[in-house]
Amino acid sequence: MKINVLDEQMQLENPELAIGRITKPVILEIWNGRQKDSVIRREYPYTRITQTENGLKACAEIEDEWVGKTEVTDVYCVEEGSVVLSRQVRILKESEYPGIRLRTEISLFPERKNNFEELRYFAPPAIYDKNDLDEDGYEDYFHTKKIIFRDDRFNYPMFTCYSEETKEAVSIERDPLPAFDSNPVRKISEETGEKEAFFLQKTDIGSMGADGSDGSTRLTCCYPFYEGDATIALYIVKMVPFGAFWPLRSGEEFTVTYRISNHKYENYHDACWYGIRDIIRKTHPQAEPLSVPPE
């Protein structure tokens, strides 16, 4: 894989085709503190891109009423056939808004068929194909084309999309793995009368998945986490969005790193099997002893 800059867009390519395109390099979601109509999406271009020994370094220096003064630094590296994207957000001066979230969107196979129905997905145990047993093109549990889950709902934080047309699989994973979590303070909302579904939280848990709600499919990652139009966590009660925001305060900063990989497979089942096999070979998972006896 290699990285190309196309009119302020970042394109990920293999020798045969473009496998992904980042059309909006910096997407920040601002929380206004409410539970309804509460997320303000802001998109920014890079203000500076420089070549590095094995990739690119891109910066966005932003100052406005939404994010205060914030700096986003992205480092793209080609490493062992993958593209590693490390993202850092630094709050230099706060705004009047309490929370912020970083969003990463990669349009898949931008020069080929890439609507939600054309691709197949794998992220055990949450997603196998589309969980679409009735074959209507929608995920069956939530009837949605937006399947985004917290990193820790997966056996391993990796999400794979496979194209039957090109026989190409594209995967995104957290590398290194999430290192910490915390218990958020979820107050009873005066708007809903229930515990907050949006809240401030310093956590290293993000979310990832696919969003095909607008006709083309994007690999989508959020940091801190956000879970689509519905969430497994709250599904028993009702279908509501669920997500955290990092405190938008002077001096705060956070970093997240993704590895984007691309391989060609004869079929979807090979993409699933060999993807998991490669993760096992790379991570060498070991059984952890129980902290207390099972009885």
How should these model regions be labeled?
Residues 265-295:
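An acidic-aromatic substrate-binding cleft motif
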